[in-house]
Amino acid sequence: MFRGMNTRQIVMDCVCIALCVLTLAAVLILWKRLPDRIVTNFDFSGEHGSYGAKSRIFVLIGIMFLLTGMFSALLRIPAVYRHINMPWTIPWGREPQIVCLTKDFLCVTNLCITVDNVYLTYACIRGKLIVWLMWLPYIVMFAATVWYLVRARKICKG
């Protein structure tokens, strides 16, 4: 099940799956206390724009499960080194390092997107969105992208 993944990748993947399951469990436990209509749309300032039935929260949770599942599946694809698409030539023998780095990057991306979706679910139920908190996972993801490219360049250049 976790073949080809290191401990850090396994932990991050399990955290993402646990966040999805906990979000679903929290919604199911609090279902009777949720308002009949929840916020389904926010504007750029974080104010609600429209309301919908509370069952629409399951669409958001379903998308969260789909994204987390896709990232988890990508982590489990066996590495085929000749198909790596990098802007630099990868020296012979360094492909496993690049694959491990890429899987780390996928884990960080998955965690950022999952945390953002959990917060969005909470904001829809609560009815208020804190805009800077919504962007925080994407800022972390941008920093991870820069880290990934710098680290990959160092590995390729030796």
Model-derived features: positions:
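Alpha-helical transmembrane segments and their helix-start/interface "positive-inside/aromatic belt" motifs
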Residues: 5-19, 58-60
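Membrane-water interface of transmembrane alpha-helices
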Residues: 29-34, 69-88, 148-156
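Interfacial helix-start motif at the membrane-water boundary
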Residues: 47-67, 100-106
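Short membrane-interface loop/juxtamembrane segments of multi-pass integral membrane proteins
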Residues: 87-102
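Alpha-helical transmembrane segments of multipass membrane proteins
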Residues: 19, 23, 63, 67-71, ...
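Active-site and channel-lining beta-strand-loop segments
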Residues: 27-59
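Alpha-helical transmembrane segments of multi-pass integral membrane proteins
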Residues: 112-158
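Select subsegments of transmembrane alpha-helices in polytopic membrane proteins
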Residues: 12-17, 70-74, 101-113
